[in-house]
From Swiss-Prot:
One of its GO terms (cellular component) is nucleus. Keywords: Metal-binding, Nucleus, Zinc, Zinc-finger. It comes from Schizosaccharomyces pombe (strain 972 / ATCC 24843) (Fission yeast). It is found in: Nucleus. Belongs to the ZNF277 family. This is Zinc finger protein C19B12.07c. It comes from the Eukaryota. The keyword Transferase does not apply. PROSITE patterns: ZINC_FINGER_C2H2_1. PANTHER family: ZINC FINGER PROTEIN 277 (PTHR13267:SF3). A zinc finger (C2H2-type) spans 146-170. GO terms for molecular function: zinc ion binding.
Length: 319
């Protein structure tokens, strides 16, 4: 079985259950009276680690917060290792565009750039994604069913689906759904806080205001804009303007910091959280444990709009 395949988990207790991560957590809840799902709504993200820990130490069943903390740390290590593996293998041209009819294959980075710049598909940066093959298969199945990725409106054919997604700017994943959470590494860092930064927070965030099952003329531009408090003062701005405000008024430029220190998106998230918490403009030394501690990936401000819009700012050459 490939490391990109879904994992089958066996119950660590005296029963014959074997299933996927969501079924396993449900099994622990209903059969073994576990509270892990109540404590952490995304406990399934570290389900295999929970099973491993309970196999090694069944007494952790009565210390569920500790169990979740250990499992979260190990699951984060797992997906970071997996992502490194995918990056190495991603240099090979093995990915097919989901929209083009030609048979040309792309490497990992080419696929993300092509999908975004040619088709406008915005699922975030390559650095955010793990289990890429399963993610693309899931997206492909949705498209082949002629269902919109964002609002799930059914269309009669491929042509109408493309027209709908173009008109509505729906070449992105549903920001209200958690079904893609397992493919975004940042979610593995926030399991025990019951805070889920979903795929929508690494794409252009636009509220959905649709209930009709048919194509409508409602424009997403009517959505109320996000507002966020400045990192260094109490003023509120839309995220892009907040980054500009920090650059001009507070001499804190996230794009310059990212470039000067060769940071990926996770490094930039760490810096945002660090500056929010400490109010410092300088960042820790390269050898500091700060760069390895998973806790700095967890937002200091829940649903921080600066993190939500980070990829948009990073990719925008005008900013």
């Amino acid at each position: 079985m490939s490391s990109d395949d879904a994992i089958i988990i066996r119950c660590p207790f005296d029963c014959e259950f074997a299933g996927d991560s969501i079924s396993f957590i449900s099994h622990l809840t209903t059969i073994h009276n576990s509270s892990v799902q109540t404590l952490a709504k995304n406990a399934y993200l570290c389900a295999s680690e929970i099973a491993n820990e309970l196999n090694q130490n069944p007494n952790l069943k009565d210390q569920e917060i500790l169990l979740l903390q250990i499992a979260q740390e190990n699951s984060l290590k797992r997906v970071l290792r997996q992502q490194q593996k995918e990056r190495r293998e991603g240099k090979i041209k093995s990915l097919q565009c989901l929209f083009c009819n030609n048979e040309g294959l792309l490497n990992r980075q080419e696929w993300f750039e092509h999908s975004f710049h040619v088709h406008g598909l915005n699922i975030g940066l390559a650095d955010n994604i793990v289990y890429i093959n399963r993610l693309l298969e899931k997206i492909k199945n949705e498209l082949e069913s002629f269902r919109c990725l964002c609002c799930h409106v059914p269309c009669k054919n491929k042509k109408l689906l493309r027209e709908h997604m173009n008109n509505k700017r729906h070449f992105r994943l549903d920001p209200k759904s958690s079904e893609y959470d397992e493919f975004y590494i940042i979610n593995y860092a926030s399991v025990t806080k019951s805070i889920t930064i979903s795929h929508s927070q690494f794409a252009i965030n636009e509220d959905i205001n649709e209930t009709d099952d048919t194509i409508s003329d409602i424009n997403d531009e009517d959505a109320e804009p996000l507002s966020v408090e400045c990192i260094f003062c109490t003023n509120f701005y839309e995220p892009v303007f907040c980054f500009e405000h920090c650059k001009i008024v507070h001499d804190w430029d996230i794009k310059k910091i990212q470039k000067d220190y060769s940071l990926d998106v996770y490094g930039a998230i760490r810096v945002i959280n660090y500056s929010r918490k400490t109010k410092k403009k300088s960042i820790p030394a390269e050898t500091d444990s700060f760069w390895k501690e998973p806790g700095w990936l967890i937002p200091v401000v829940p649903d921080d709009a600066l993190i939500i819009c980070l990829s948009e700012v990073i990719e925008d050459p005008r900013l």
